[in-house]
Amino acid sequence: MKLGFLTACMPERPLEEIAAWAGAHGFAALELAAWPSIGDRPFTAAHVAADAFDAAEADRVRGALDGNGLSLSALAYYDNNLHPDPAERDAYHAHLRACIDAAAALGGVPVGTFIGRDPGRSVSENLREAERVFPPLVDYAGERGVRLMVENCVMEGWHPDGYPGNLAYSPELWEWMFELGLWLNFDPSHLLWLGIDPLGALRPYVDKVVHAHAKDAEVFAEQRNRFGFFGRTSTRDQDPWDMGWWRYRIPGLGQVDFPRYVDALYEGGFDGVLSIEHEDPVWGGSPEKVEQGLEIAQRNLRPLLVG
């Protein structure tokens, strides 16, 4: 298993600089952010120009990685494939196909996305719509030797009341999406705050995991007693992502049992990339703090990996 990180935590830095830093600090892989330029939306970046991908861009990406002893674990473009606005949805699908094309040219690495949700429709209506939307995208990827994977992030900030905005947050929904030909980018942090045992959820499905995130979560029980499971209400409009009773952390600084998580991946036969997704507010806010957070994560995770 190799250790890498998702480059979205360094949105202002060019790929060449990120790759040089990663190689110099002992990382083995990068999961490259491949969003289009979408302003200051947090935890997105454009380190691969998927919408203008050509031979020169492929050479640039390969050169940055190869020159620093790094492999490419995946392309990351996580957006709402069930967006209620048809024009927005079409744009997301077009960019997702561009990411698939880029991934095919870069060796057939997986492409990460979300199911998403139309918040104005019921869950069952969204599932039926997804069953219409995703087969052409899965076929497009398969024809190019690329696996389309979905992260089990809740995306509660996409729903006005903090309900799940990405219908891939539980094992029940994973089984449904596997039937559509989708794969899983497993992240234990989301399950922890949902009250789902990450290890119990993972073990039956390791063979469907093509990429694994390393992100921790910290739950504050006393705050949950104040706000309830669904989080803040009267102040939600100030920050729809802040539920008030939990937060993401660097691996090892929250409550996920990472030794057992990595062991469960190994036991199930996973030998891919463990990719740190850095969204820790304590170790963020400046380039220096982000780097320090990644170094803490590496120190905590590297002893768990074989090779």
Language model feature labels by segment:
Residues 56-61, 172, 198, 257-261:
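Alpha-helical scaffolding within the catalytic cores
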Residues 30, 268-279:
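Conserved active-site loop/cleft motifs that coordinate metal ions or position small ligands
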